[in-house]
Amino acid sequence: SRGLGDVYKRQAIAYAISSKNKHTPIRPVQTYQPASNFDSEENVERKVKAVDEMFNKEEFLSWTRSLFVKLQEAWTARDWSTIRVFETNELFEQHQKQLQGYIDRKQINVMERICVLSVKLADFKQTGNKDVLTVVLKSRMNDYIIDETTGKIVKGDKTTDRYSTYKLDFIRTTGEKTKPGSIEINTTNCPNCGAPTQITSSGKCEYCGSVITTGEHSWALSNLEKIG
């Protein structure tokens, strides 16, 4: 089945305008990036700490694990608004559109038994006014599609585990530093006005109207690509 990981990366996703079904997606071409193309985790950590001495590798990778699981759960729940704060505008809109395709077809892509097997730093660079931190994550999960009305499986099965490797790119504004408590999986306060807020699909604080994404203040997911 076409799990969440198979629809990541803007450059790798396309839609076929079919005469039979205008929502028919083309399975993206997987781009396999050899491990040799990545930097060593020690070098990556050193590069990040050179510009952000408070960066904590263990905390960041733990947050990445939690976020990855949260992504899969939100995909199954078909409620991408809970992810708004953690993604860039472009990536959020891409994923929201893809998820809407399942909703329109009255299908649910179920992701179950999600297990993050490993996660490590793979690259760090500064481009333009952005810091870009790359992570490689390996996972195991069950992935199948059901009809929302009947509950009948239309693709995949409940017993087969899928092993996959992903490349996650996180960005933030260059010059931002790690602050205690700045990386949280449950963001409930607007970083601009401090008010407790619900994250809407537009990503705006309901009190001050500011667009809320973690990329302005901390790391935000800009790309997640299946590489193996």
Q: Where would I find each of the regions flagged by the language model?
A:
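Transmembrane-cytosolic junction motif
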Residues: 13-33
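Core segments of small alpha/beta cavity-forming domains
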Residues: 32-113, 192, 206-207, 211, ...
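Surface-exposed, charged secondary-structure patches
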Residues: 106-149
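Short flexible coil/turn linkers enriched for glycine and charged/polar residues
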Residues: 126-131, 162, 184, 199
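Cys/His-clustered metal-coordination modules, chiefly Zn-binding fingers
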Residues: 168-228
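Short, small-residue-biased leader/transition segments that mark boundaries at the very start
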Residues: 2-8
